[in-house]
Amino acid sequence: MNISSFSDNLTKILGKYEDLSEKLSSGIGGEEFVKASKEYADLEDIVQKIKEYNKAKAELEEANNFKQEPSLDKATLEMIEEEIRNLEDSLPTLERSVKIALLPKDEADSKSAIIEIRAGTGGEEAALFAAKLFNMYQRYAELKGWRFEILSIDETGIGGYKEVSASIKGKDVFSKLKFESGVHRVQRVPETESQGRIHTSAATVAVLPEVEDVDIKLEEKDLRIDTYRASGAGGQHVNTTDSAVRITHIPTGITVALQDEKSQHKNKAKALKILRARIYEEERRKKDQERANNRRKQIGSGDRSERIRTYNFPQGRVSDHRINLTLYKIDEVINGQLDEFIEALIANDEAKKLSDI
């Protein structure tokens, strides 16, 4: 984006903001008022950043002009030169802030999320690691004040999880957690290891935006719903009614099975919630892939097939391989203190997008 088009863009945004302000003050009502109010609210953040940027630019121009005054004494000149240096230092940061606010928004960022964790290679140790990851995200949600609800859980005999999913509700949850999708690897000495050897195992994390009926319409004709008796460990039936539910979305082949609740109705409701999220994410993935093909580049660092992070317990370190960030704070991270990684991943994503402008 060249300087002229960047400046023109800012002028247009400020103009639109003023027009919306006048429109809202003119006494409009109904749907027109709702639409204008939303547009106005959506622009408030970027307008505030543009005004700060324009103010700094104007102050810099004024200071440079004042510096040319022949009657200035030495002390005043030094004061002006210091002000110019400070303004010149702040402008790139303010400009970057504006450009980031101008980046196309991911429509899913404001949504709540569904997180799914599956034990990967490593047997029982992988299942224990999956449980530890699940607890880590649950703790992170608590620290953020988000609502955390377990949707389904498939436990092993010694406290591990073969597979587990949860709904995390709150503002901008998906924007924070979307970069957690991928293969997480752990290196540690299992409690059952008598020789003290380090084992490596893995778990897969998938983060999906939680969607409502308005986002994904599920037609009855597109769904195949099977019911069956819930079974426990070893395959024995734990319920005398057909409370377990399996729903298949015929057009995509996506299937969700749930048996956690004793009520078939509750299992169906939870299964539909997960199904909507998976279909929505599949549509997002296809759109991302189309954009990637158009630009002849790979999009998205959340590819679930790639190893994204390693948790090394003997060394007390956690390494994110996408951004080459290593923190020697494994206890804090496992206890839900993820912001340092999450903020770095968001900044990395913004930098990539800015380089494409």
Swiss-Prot record:
GO terms for molecular function: translation release factor activity, codon specific. The keyword Nucleotide-binding does not apply. Gene3D superfamilies: 3.30.160.20, 3.30.70.1660, 6.10.140.1950. It holds the Pfam family PCRF. Its main location: cytoplasm. GO terms for cellular component: cytoplasm. InterPro entries: PCRF, Pep_chain_release_fac_I, Pep_chain_release_fac_I_sf, Prokaryotic/Mito_RF, RF-1. Residues 284-313 are annotated as: Disordered. Methylated by PrmC. Methylation increases the termination efficiency of RF1. HAMAP family: Rel_fac_1. PANTHER family: LD18447P (PTHR43804:SF7). This is Peptide chain release factor 1. The lineage of its organism: Bacteria, Pseudomonadati, Pseudomonadota, Alphaproteobacteria, Rickettsiales.
